[in-house]
Amino acid sequence: MNFKNHHQKKRFGQHWLVNNLILEKIKEVAELDEKDFILEIGPGKGALTSKLLDSKISRLHAVELDKDLIDLLNNKFRNDKKFSLQQGDILSTNLDSINKKITKVIANIPYNITGPILDIFIGRLGIVSKNNYKKIIFLMQKDVVDRILSKESSKNAGAMSVRMQLISNIKRICDVPPSSFNPPPKVFSSLVVFEPLRPEKRLDIKLERYIDKLLQISFNSRRKMIRNTLNSILSEDEIKKLAELSEICFNSRPQDISINKWIKLAEGCIKITNKN
């Protein structure tokens, strides 16, 4: 078999990037140098892989789920000592032997595994990552990026935006039309760069966990006012004290609360509950 005879598998969510301008843009925003150890998720036919290997990098390790592509990729890059390939599902692949060496992660993410991919590589509130990723460059569904970057009082505001913005710096580079892929997906994509915050730049872990707790209970009932949501974890007296401490309008709905106010709300909850 060769690449021409290989057909994309729908079950793997394969939409291969064929727009050379976007391939070059990914390489550009990665800001690669000779110290970089790249993890590429889902190299496909190796179009982006080729451009990355042409850069001054230390190494590129690719993880590909499709077994039919393994021999083809190994053959294509057999003369490049910087290249290594692993067959497997990135959601369950063991990367322990190289994880501390990886500096940048680059991927055209299958839409059906976006959530788990974000949890693994960007991280979660209340969990300190042992990874050393400087940049994570993802090509992902535009609607998801809209949600991640949304601000309070917007239609896309939600728990995901607060969580992602608290643990990483995020920048949308450009939107990418369906015609840039083969086969074209039904929706637009966005090229986005995440820079995970170092542990010393993160909030206190206990505070992060409480924020996460508040986000979960609040956005599960996003039409309810915060006052009514807090009834499930605080007494009426505690809610009154919290209103004084946090200076937040408790008639607000969760999507109308800014990130800074979520922090104040969690700090107030911790202070009140620790006194009792």
UniProtKB/Swiss-Prot annotation:
Keywords, alphabetical: Cytoplasm, Methyltransferase, RNA-binding, rRNA processing, S-adenosyl-L-methionine, Transferase
CDD domains assigned: AdoMet_MTases
Catalytic activity: adenosine(1518)/adenosine(1519) in 16S rRNA + 4 S-adenosyl-L-methionine = N(6)-dimethyladenosine(1518)/N(6)-dimethyladenosine(1519) in 16S rRNA + 4 S-adenosyl-L-homocysteine + 4 H(+)
Keyword rRNA processing: yes
Spans traversing the lipid bilayer: none
GO terms, molecular function: 16S rRNA (adenine(1518)-N(6)/adenine(1519)-N(6))-dimethyltransferase activity; RNA binding
Enzyme Commission code(s) on record: 2.1.1.182
Localization, UniProt: Cytoplasm
Top-tier EC class: transferase
Annotated GO CC locations: cytosol
Primary site of residence: cytoplasm
Protein family (similarity comment): Belongs to the class I-like SAM-binding methyltransferase superfamily. rRNA adenine N(6)-methyltransferase family. RsmA subfamily.
Stated role: Specifically dimethylates two adjacent adenosines (A1518 and A1519) in the loop of a conserved hairpin near the 3'-end of 16S rRNA in the 30S particle. May play a critical role in biogenesis of 30S subunits.
HAMAP family membership: 16SrRNA_methyltr_A
Protein name: Ribosomal RNA small subunit methyltransferase A
Organism: Prochlorococcus marinus (strain MIT 9515)
Gene: rsmA
